[in-house]
Amino acid sequence: MKSLFKKKLCLASLSAVIFALSACGAKTTGPAPEVAIDLGRSSLYTPEELNIAVLLIKDKFVTFAGCELHSIRYAGDDANNEKNLEWLNSLREVRSNIPPEDVGKQYVQVAEFLSNFHSPVEDGDYAWNQDMEYTDYQWWLGRLDDGRWEIVSWGY
């Protein structure tokens, strides 16, 4: 009988600890908000090609601790020009994390995206101003001749 009581007491204590730990610092925010995507119109890229670029941006954005992404939009075909292509290729030349098989390759196309997001409400060790809406945050992607996109630069 004592053994059964001890098991129940231990189980109840463990449940209370788990509940308490799960509530510590936890915030019930509900489901993640929808991110509005605007691919606009492009005579250079298909919607599928632009969506692949958007997925790369979303994957990178996940590293923006505490930030909430609201929207991403394609900035238009005008960004794909010689000046921007030279700029992105110059940035690629100084990168140290290029796979050996891609060393020496150049971007053949450029795409710019703009995003809106909100920085963390809580004060923390973040690179962002607290509780602020960031608008038209730039994402610059270069495209290699095999069709792969790479995020080259982001920010203002």
List each language-model region with its residue ranges.
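Short beta-strand edge/turn micro-motifs at domain boundaries
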Residues: 134-156
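Sec-dependent N-terminal signal peptides of Gram-positive bacterial secreted proteins and lipoproteins
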Residues: 3-27
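Flexible low-complexity loop/turn motifs enriched in small/helix-breaking residues
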Residues: 24-124, 131-133
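Functionally constrained cores in energy, signaling, and assembly domains
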Residues: 8, 15, 115, 138, ...
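Catalytic micro-motifs at enzyme active sites that drive phosphoryl/nucleotidyl and oxygen chemistry
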Residues: 126-128, 139
